[in-house]
């Protein structure tokens, strides 16, 4: 059996010791919730605790907290977010929880991207859900929160001012400029941002829009990027989706893009340098994504995706890596 958090092999169903500590402070929490999924349970139980929708408005998020060693739904002092199987017209939606869990684990375990503790959990009716610990809640016993803003708020773009597609109006270059403007330690944070944008491209997260990047204020008074969130291979659910939610550059495409019709090594090299990252550092970060096929395959195989979706996930990643290593020559 594999741990429902990190995929480590264990002798029982549930979470390994490390994941119990990271997720629940060491409390022995069961990986099966004591109630059915929202589709089989009293809708009022869930409706009062819904947070918001994602995956283009088809996935509900619910607030949870730890009561002793049990996870319970709550409408206040939430410590966790629960995302059950979405409903809608997208493909393979029953695989969405496992997809997000795997993609978040890949980011955290293999690509040096900070992610909050997360896991797969199950309802009593065996339906899976994605569980993630909130990173904005302080561990001070008072359930206070770190001040946080997403980059739509920072850029002051809203549906009222920019229309329904406001989340997709900026470019990644413009988010980088906002990081420079609002975060004093921007040199460090820009490298984190660059790594995350590259990860989203390679693992086909086509919904990494401006609201899926945020900054927060630490106890020390420093502004930093939050841990990454909402990472998943959206192409599994929306095959015709664009490679990226936003363009790399503000108002142009590179010569490499014009020649190839898609982003490649040259685009990300140029993008990193446009952000102000030294070329040697950009090259180093890009190179860290190479040669990890065996490690990626191991996590995909250990994940809770359906077997045929595992094959698709690997195929999509390999295709994107093939594109990524195309070098443009003038």
Task: For the regions a language model picked out, list residue spans one by one.
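Short linear loop/turn motifs
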Residues: 121-126, 167, 283-292
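ATP-dependent phospho-/nucleotidyl transfer catalytic cores
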Residues: 124, 131-202, 267-270, 274, ...
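Catalytic-core segments of enzymes that bind and process phosphorylated/nucleotide-bearing substrates
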Residues: 150-176, 218-279
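Conserved ATP-binding subdomain of kinase catalytic cores across diverse folds
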Residues: 41-163
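A residue-level signal for conserved active-site and pocket-lining positions in enzyme catalytic cores
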Residues: 64, 107, 151, 207, ...
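Regulatory N- and C-terminal appendages and interdomain linkers associated
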Residues: 1-42, 46-48, 223-225, 294-330
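Conserved kinase catalytic-core segment
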Residues: 95-110, 168-239
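Mobile late-domain/C-terminal helix-loop "cap" segments
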Residues: 257-303, 307, 311-318
């Amino acid at each position: 059996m594999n741990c429902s958090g990190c995929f480590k092999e264990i002798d029982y169903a549930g979470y390994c010791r490390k994941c119990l500590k990271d997720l629940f402070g060491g409390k022995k929490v069961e990986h099966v919730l004591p109630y059915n999924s929202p589709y089989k349970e009293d809708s009022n139980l869930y409706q009062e605790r819904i947070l918001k929708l994602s995956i283009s408005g088809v996935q509900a998020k619910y607030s949870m907290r730890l009561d002793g060693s049990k996870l319970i739904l709550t409408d206040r002092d939430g410590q966790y977010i629960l995302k059950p199987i979405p409903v809608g017209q997208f493909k393979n939606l029953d695989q969405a929880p496992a997809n997000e869990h795997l993609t978040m684990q890949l980011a955290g375990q293999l690509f040096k991207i900070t992610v909050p503790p997360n896991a797969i959990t199950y309802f009593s009716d065996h339906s899976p859900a994605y569980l993630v610990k909130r990173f904005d809640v302080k561990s001070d016993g008072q359930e206070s929160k770190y001040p946080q803003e997403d980059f739509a708020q920072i850029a002051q773009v809203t549906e009222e001012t920019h229309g329904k597609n406001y989340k997709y109006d900026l470019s990644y270059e413009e988010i980088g400029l906002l990081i420079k403007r609002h975060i004093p330690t921007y040199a460090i944070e820009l490298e984190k941002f660059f790594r995350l944008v590259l990860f989203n491209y390679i693992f086909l997260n086509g919904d990494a829009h401006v609201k899926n990047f945020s900054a927060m204020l630490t106890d020390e008074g420093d502004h930093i990027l939050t841990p990454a969130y909402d990472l998943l291979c959206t192409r599994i659910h929306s095959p015709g989706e664009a490679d990226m939610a936003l363009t790399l550059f503000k108002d142009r495409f590179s010569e490499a893009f014009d020649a190839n019709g898609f982003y490649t090594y040259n685009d990300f090299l140029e993008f990193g340098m446009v952000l102000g990252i030294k070329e040697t550092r950009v090259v180093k970060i890009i190179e860290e994504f190479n040669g990890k096929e065996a490690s990626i395959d191991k996590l995909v195989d250990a994940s809770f995706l359906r077997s045929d979706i595992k094959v698709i996930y690997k195929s999509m990643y390999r295709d994107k890596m093939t594109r990524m290593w195309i070098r443009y020559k003038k």
